[in-house]
Amino acid sequence: MKTYVSLGIGDLFFLDSILTKEEKESISEIYWACRFGYVMEKLMEGNKSYPNLKAQYTIDDEVGKKAMATLDPVAVDFWHFRPDFHPNFETGLKLFDIEDEWNNQNLQTIDAPSMFLDDTRPFQSSSFIKHSKAIDDEYILFHYPTSTRPRNDIASITMDDWDFVDELSKYHRMRVLVIADSTIDVPLSSYELLIKPDIKHVVDLVANCDYYAGCDSFCSILAAKALPKDKMFIKQSPNFTGWNNWLYRAFLPHSPEEVRQIYKQHIGR
């Protein structure tokens, strides 16, 4: 069925892991009503767990920004037209020119926030991990905070964080693959800096890493679908306000107790 979706990349990895096989197979077309739709379109291309997905549609960035400015000027740079907010949803339908599809019940929406909080939806599997390409290497994957997010919205990496990762690297004799979106100084003994690698390659890197460390991001959510708790070190966002069901479930299949051990104010044990 034609499907309307509005979420972030990390949310996609979360959503995919709780959709049933039947739900995945029901999707024939996707309308990505969000800024990074073009990234998710690429992620979904050729995904064998969605065998009936034949077409995907996105909104041009400038078009999305202009439309968002009339709804919520503060959110222009991270525009989205969620189906659970009626004015936003109406705007998204109009931009895709699919009002008739909705009115004729030929379109389904995915209310991701409600699904994320639904305890009756257990972890199923990650199709992205399942269909990733094998990498014959041993390494620690480190995701450095993006330069485009406000500093009060994403973790900062300290020398203590770097020191822990360096010691982990030396102990296991593994190099560290550092993913970043710009040139940064990396105070590690053995590393390779990957600047804006292809998103599908990022998935492969996450799926095959021996350890994951870094900021709370889409990489950390995906890593949780592949690694045991003792091989993950995620640094909290500085605007962390406390534990909640959404946060716990984002890191499924780990239990809330395990998430508390993984997700800390520092990178380390």
PLM features per residue range, with description:
Residues I27-F36, L177-A180, F233-K235:
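Short internal beta-strands
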Residues M1-E101, H201-D204, G214, C219-L222:
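Active-site and donor-binding regions of nucleotide-sugar-utilizing enzymes
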Residues E41-N47, S182-Y191, L222-A226, T241-Y248:
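Short loop/helix-cap segments at secondary-structure boundaries that form the rim of catalytic
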Residues L141-A155, M159-V202, L222:
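Catalytic donor nucleotide-activated moiety binding site of glycosyltransferases and closely related
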Residues L53-I59, P83-E138:
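A nucleotide-sugar donor-handling region in carbohydrate enzymes
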Residues I27, H172-M174, L227-K231:
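A short helix->loop->beta-strand "cap" motif at the edges of active sites that frequently abuts
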Residues I221-R269:
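Nucleotide-sugar donor-binding patch of glycosyltransferase catalytic domains
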Residues C209:
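An anion/phosphate-binding loop that grips the pyrophosphate of nucleotide cofactors and donors
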